[in-house]
Amino acid sequence: ILQNLHCQKKPWRIFDYGLAISIFRDNSTRTRFSFASAVNGLGLALAELDEVKSQIAHGETVRETANMISFLTEVIGIRDDMYPGEGHTYMLEVANAISEGYQQGILAQRPAVINLQCDLDHPTQVLSDLLKLKDYFGGWENLKGKKIAMSWAYSPSYGKPLSVPQGIINLMTRFGMNVVLAHPEGYDLLPETIQSAFSFAQESGGSFSQTTLMEEAFQNADIVYPKSWAPMSVMQQRTKLLKAGDKQGLKELELHCLAQNEKYIDWECDDEMMKLTKNGNALYEHCLPADISDVSCENGEVAKSVFEKYRLHTYQEAGYKPFVIAAMIFMSKVKEPVAKLRSFV
């Protein structure tokens, strides 16, 4: 609805004033500007917290910072995705701090906290992926029984978060889809996310399975999502080295991981791999930016020919994100959302 209103150039503001705060602890293009677009559309001004330039650098606590930035703030968006066991915990700490501030009368309103990607999940991204599937296949009811291959793919870089594949297997299994997770041995996701994917599949009537063969996952798939990620053990080791300030250890770990990735350089979504999919014409999805062979790198996640065929689809996929974020904020802030939406139309 919000996207349609935007296309019709109709406003959908719900705030007359106030701030939205973004905290990015990792690089971002799509999510950063999607958050900015969402809060602007809702009527908020945007301020980005630079932790290096704030008193956090001098030891200010999360509890104090969260309250100090929230006096006129309606929403806080956080990306903290690089370190297993850290990102989601930090978001909960911020949420608890501002809840306490609101309950004790320090804050006049309790800001919504939006997960812009953590160590466990990337909800705004995978919801955008889901909306693309809903529109592509013609409705929610048509997703049931569709096979999606969430596959690791080769990348010439290391240290990519686990949150996108974890988010995909835990969202698509809720819609009765047949989700296949493929990765080489050693590139495991967090155990709790695997366990929950099995549970969601059982509840929805779909299925969830794992394989160490990319070809098996692609066989007769309706959707493919080839993306690189770092082994869970590597991310955990990286976190320890960063906390210890061990720069030499980090360099050695990077070299080890790049060499390990090289063993699986043939894990690429190319034309031959796509021929294995249903009618050789599965929908390709990616959170972007993709590592495109002979474009952004010599060898990568996806062949140039495949990416070019689906490029506009991936852009449309990304285009849902501002409205996903806006909807999250809208639903958390509007007491009668249906009536409010009707007032916009």
What function would you assign to each model-found segment?
Residues 1-13:
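An N-terminal, well-structured beta->alpha segment
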Residues 13-23, 27-134:
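Phosphate/diphosphate ligand-binding glycine-rich loop within oxidoreductases
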Residues 25-37, 134-240, 244-248:
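Glycine-rich phosphate/diphosphate-binding loop of Rossmann-like nucleotide-binding domains
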Residues 104-111, 177, 276-285:
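A short helix->loop->beta-strand "cap" motif at the edges of active sites that frequently abuts
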Residues 142-144, 173, 272-281, 309:
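Short, conserved loop/helix-junction motifs that constitute active-site signature segments
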Residues 199-303:
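Rossmann-like adenosine-cofactor binding region
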Residues 277-345:
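Adenosine-phosphate binding glycine-rich loop
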